[in-house]
Curated annotation (Swiss-Prot):
Subunit (UniProt): Binds the armadillo repeat of CTNNB1 and forms a stable complex. Interacts with EP300, TLE1 and PIASG. Binds ALYREF/THOC4, MDFI and MDFIC. Interacts with NLK. Interacts with DAZAP2.
Species of provenance: Homo sapiens
Comp. bias (Gly residues): 1-14
Positions bearing the Glycyl lysine isopeptide (Lys-Gly) (interchain with G-Cter in SUMO) cross-link: K27, K269
Compartment(s) of residence: Nucleus
Record-annotated DNA-binding residue ranges: 299-367
Name of protein: Lymphoid enhancer-binding factor 1
Gene Ontology molecular-function annotations: armadillo repeat domain binding; beta-catenin binding; C2H2 zinc finger domain binding; chromatin binding; DNA binding; DNA binding, bending; DNA-binding transcription activator activity, RNA polymerase II-specific; DNA-binding transcription factor activity
Length: 399
């Protein structure tokens, strides 16, 4: 407990003083009489209207059977109109404790042959991305909007009647609602009616959701009921009354003009086997030409004087030194070769001359270019083969 800051210690201070972190209850807080008087002064008429609405809804739910669903909805709408009038007159004070869902959206009556598409941006119960329409239920004797999840999202919206009405006209078979308090006939508000769009069962197609409903898939509902019209009927006449942000146009070609990959890949796959087969045909022909040519044996050139000296003295150097690297052994042999006198070197030069004469007798037409020019000959052969027609065929296959 934090101690008091008084001079008399813990118990010597003023009894009405207390710690700063404790709650100080006021004497006029929670007086039921004042709250009741304030509530009667603030909204006497609204409480009476709410009581009438609650009592009428309870009586209707007990008396009317479940078969007369349309009549119940119409009477519930009639009973809710005074509440809407009060809500329009007092927008700040007329909010319902259950969330006030009826303050923003208009009340719709049942029209046969119409599909109900309310304003998706203003209705609070459609902002969560759910496509299923709300069905009224009673919670604490007050109607509350709750979306239905047990049925298909689009089946409650579409009726099976072939009748069509203009959006701005009032149907003749529906009686006008009568306000019980004012005693005058009222029609549904005109700005709310254009949100109803006629849709025949034959022209119903796959309704594409707007951008806000990308998370939920929408399936075509034409298979759920019988179609009096052929399936090839154009949907443009019935769908033209919808706004453009709800139903996009028919899918056209790709924006970049590039065809779909599924269309291009079969052609590429057809070309690849041809190129592989061409390469397989080229390789055996080249190998066959090599096999047909006679294999000439590799003729070594005759040894010179230094190489004859290395051949003779290499075993002695390896025995004397522990080195096994060929480069180091060659360096030692080179130093010893240069250390020899002219007479000693002349002996190896004479051996080299005899080696050349013997080589010329054995291979009279031999030249050193035959050994060193093999790579150039191979390149020349490849160029000649490409010029003869093998190369252009391969390039044509890749085009």
């Amino acid at each position: 407990m934090p101690q008091l800051s008084g001079g008399g210690g813990g118990g010597g201070g003023d009894p009405e003083l207390c710690a700063t972190d404790e709650m100080i209850p006021f004497k006029d807080e929670g007086d039921p009489q004042k709250e009741k008087i304030f509530a009667e002064i603030s909204h006497p008429e609204e409480e009476g209207d709410l009581a009438d609405i609650k009592s009428s809804l309870v009586n209707e739910s007990e008396i009317i059977p479940a078969s007369n669903g349309h009549e119940v909805a119409r009477q519930a709408q009639t009973s809710q109109e005074p509440y809407h009038d009060k809500a329009r007159e007092h927008p700040d004070d007329g909010k319902h404790p259950d969330g006030g869902l009826y303050n923003k959206g208009p009340s719709y009556s049942s029209y046969s042959g119409y599909i109900m598409m309310p304003n998706m941006n203003n209705d609070p119960y459609m902002s969560n991305g759910s496509l299923s329409p709300p069905i009224p239920r009673t919670s604490n004797k007050v109607p509350v909007v709750q979306p239905s999840h047990a049925v298909h999202p689009l089946t409650p919206l579409i009726t099976y009647s072939d009748e069509h009405f203009s959006p701005g006209s009032h149907p003749s078979h529906i009686p006008s609602d009568v306000n019980s308090k004012q005693g005058m006939s009222r029609h549904p508000p005109a700005p709310d009616i254009p949100t109803f769009y006629p849709l025949s069962p034959g022209g119903v197609g796959q309704i594409t959701p707007p951008l806000g409903w990308q998370g939920q898939p929408v399936y075509p509902i034409t298979g759920g009921f019988r179609q009096p019209y052929p399936s090839s009927l154009s949907v443009d006449t019935s769908m033209s009354r919808f706004s453009h942000h709800m139903i996009p146009g028919p899918p056209g070609p790709h924006t970049t003009g590039i065809p779909h990959p599924a269309i291009v890949t079969p052609q590429v796959k057809q070309e690849h086997p041809h190129t592989d087969s061409d390469l397989m045909h080229v390789k055996p022909q080249h190998e066959q030409r090599k096999e047909q040519e006679p294999k000439r044996p590799h003729i070594k050139k005759p040894l010179n004087a230094f190489m004859l000296y290395m051949k003779e003295m290499r075993a002695n150097v390896v025995a004397e030194c522990t080195l096994k690297e060929s480069a180091a052994i060659n360096q030692i042999l080179g130093r010893r070769w240069h250390a020899l006198s002219r007479e000693e070197q002349a002996k190896y030069y004479e051996l080299a001359r005899k080696e050349r004469q013997l080589h010329m007798q054995l291979y009279p037409g031999w030249s050193a270019r035959d050994n060193y020019g093999k790579k150039k000959k191979r390149k020349r052969e490849k160029l000649q083969e490409s010029a003869s027609g093998t190369g252009p065929r391969m390039t044509a296959a890749y085009i």
